[in-house]
């Protein structure tokens, strides 16, 4: 990204951070540039704003931005990012074939000497995805799946929730197919996952129309073809092939199956899903379930603990691998801030964490799944194991637990609360698509996120509960007992 656009985005982040006046000198000190440059950038941003956004500049006070309450600053940062040559070059290469730098410069209305530094920035952007930019002829080079993931990342940070960057591919049609998929698989996709999936499907279809082919070299990926989900998804995408005039290969269908499985969703009938998953696991007829069994056996041997008898743990691991295992090799492309819950597991359950790290790393290498496993994934498996251990020493009553963290942390937190309060509570976890208007069948709710449910008492706690949180829960339980 060009320095001026990057700086303009930073200015926007500063002036939208608080409802107050910011002096240009104050901003220039933060960004370490001259006052004149800041004034020029603010003038550019002012002309760039939508009609219902306003920037006021007052002598002696500075600059202040007024934006509608239902709008987010990202709407402008998206627009600014799309002005960058990095985006425009990659967008052009996505839309049409351009074989020479001279032709690219001409089509973008830029002089050749001016486009060369931008191409260098594009090369640096591509590096984190393991991709290269070839000059003769001009093209992206690398694994086709990585190219699609790169474009997914690019478009997600360039367009807001209501925008659709694929002119010749109808958004309504793709969303209609996603709705059919939800019905067939018995799931409800998170609204963010629907957007991600719709973009990914559009990118895959566009690349297919241009003649690009997906190659999947890891043997275990083909285990997907044995699963019921693959069969259901395949039937639905036969209609998609006719709609968009493409022919999907086995590799394409596997990739689409993986992208759907690894999305964020909840089961419409969790008990039915749990029963079927445990049954498939015990029958041992599907290769992917045999992989999970091998992993659990290795964990048992290393930790000297019985896990195979815990059906809750079996389902948790099967569901975890269903969502995660297929894209482990691509997770390294995305840097994620380390969550507080991960650090907690590393310190509070260091022995289990170390054992899981050793077993998991050996497992992915032996089965040629990935080269390494991130601490986040190690922590998730650690949470499931510790939740299983806690279940064996806890009795339950009933409470609804709502968290904004991962499913694995919800499992661990539920078991921790059950352990803490003995037979006074039974914990059930739930997924909220919204933060209000949800049918709740519980005496009270324990939540780590704000909720608006007037009919049911709510106790808000921290992601990692404090003694004060435990005291509040105990106080409420005592009130109920009284």
Swiss-Prot record:
**Keyword annotations from UniProtKB, A to Z:** Activator, Capsule biogenesis/degradation, Plasmid, Repeat, Transcription, Transcription regulation, Virulence
Name its GO BP terms in alphabetical order: regulation of DNA-templated transcription
Residue ranges annotated for the PRD domain, each copy included: 165-270, 283-395
- Induction of its expression: Transcriptionally regulated by AtxA. Transcription is also positively controlled by carbonic acid and CO(2).
Looking up InterPro entries in the UniProt record yields:
BglG_antiterminators (IPR050661), HTH_Mga_DNA-bd_dom (IPR013199), Mga_HTH (IPR007737), PRD (IPR011608), PRD_sf (IPR036634)
Top-rank lineage group of the source organism: Bacteria
Q: One Pfam family of this protein, by short name?
A: Mga
Q: What is its biological role? A: AcpB and AcpA regulate cap gene expression and capsule synthesis.
Record's family?
A: Belongs to the AtxA/AcpA family.
What this protein is called in its record is: Capsule synthesis positive regulator AcpB
């Amino acid at each position: 990204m060009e320095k001026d656009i990057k700086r303009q985005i930073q200015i926007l982040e500063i002036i939208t951070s608080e409802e107050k006046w910011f002096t240009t000198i104050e901003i220039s000190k933060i960004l370490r540039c001259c006052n004149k440059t800041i004034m020029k950038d603010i003038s550019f941003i002012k002309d760039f704003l939508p009609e219902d956004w306003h920037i006021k500049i007052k002598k002696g006070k500075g600059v202040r931005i007024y934006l509608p309450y239902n709008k987010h600053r990202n709407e402008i940062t998206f627009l600014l990012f799309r002005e960058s040559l990095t985006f425009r070059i990659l967008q052009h290469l996505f839309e049409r074939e351009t074989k020479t730098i001279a032709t690219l410069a001409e089509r973008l209305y830029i002089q050749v000497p001016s486009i060369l530094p931008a191409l260098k920035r594009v090369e640096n952007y591509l590096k984190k995805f393991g991709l290269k930019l070839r000059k003769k002829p001009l093209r992206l080079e690398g694994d086709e799946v990585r190219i699609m993931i790169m474009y997914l990342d690019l478009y997600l940070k360039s367009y807001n929730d209501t925008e659709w960057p694929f002119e010749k591919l109808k958004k309504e049609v793709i969303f209609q197919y996603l709705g059919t998929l939800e019905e067939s698989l018995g799931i409800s996709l998170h609204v963010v996952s629907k957007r991600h999936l719709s973009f990914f499907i559009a990118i895959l279809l566009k690349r297919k129309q241009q003649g690009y082919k997906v190659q999947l070299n890891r043997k275990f990926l083909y285990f997907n073809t044995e699963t019921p989900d693959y069969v259901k998804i395949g039937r639905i995408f036969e209609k998609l092939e006719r709609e968009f005039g493409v022919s999907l290969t086995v590799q394409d269908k596997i990739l689409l199956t993986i992208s759907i499985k690894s999305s964020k969703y909840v089961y419409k009938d969790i008990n039915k899903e749990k029963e079927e998953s445990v049954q498939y696991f015990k029958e041992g007829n599907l290769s992917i379930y045999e992989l999970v069994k091998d992993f659990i056996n290795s964990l048992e041997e290393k930790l000297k603990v019985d896990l195979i008898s815990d059906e809750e743990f079996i389902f948790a691991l099967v569901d975890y691998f269903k969502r995660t295992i297929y894209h482990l090799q691509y997770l390294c492309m995305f840097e994620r801030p380390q969550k507080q819950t991960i650090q907690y597991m590393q310190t509070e359950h260091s022995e289990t964490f170390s054992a899981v790290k050793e077993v998991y790393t050996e497992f992915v290498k032996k089965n040629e799944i990935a080269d390494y496993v991130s601490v986040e994934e190690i922590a998730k498996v650690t949470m499931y194991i510790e939740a299983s251990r806690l279940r064996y020493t806890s009795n339950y009553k009933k409470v609804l637990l709502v968290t904004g963290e991962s499913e694995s942390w919800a499992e661990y937190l539920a078991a921790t609360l059950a352990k803490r309060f003995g037979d006074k509570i039974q914990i059930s976890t739930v997924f909220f698509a919204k933060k209000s208007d949800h049918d709740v069948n519980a005496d009270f709710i324990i939540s780590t996120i704000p909720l608006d449910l007037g009919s049911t008492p709510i106790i808000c706690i921290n992601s990692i509960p404090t003694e004060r949180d435990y005291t509040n829960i105990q106080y409420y339980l005592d009130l109920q007992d009284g």
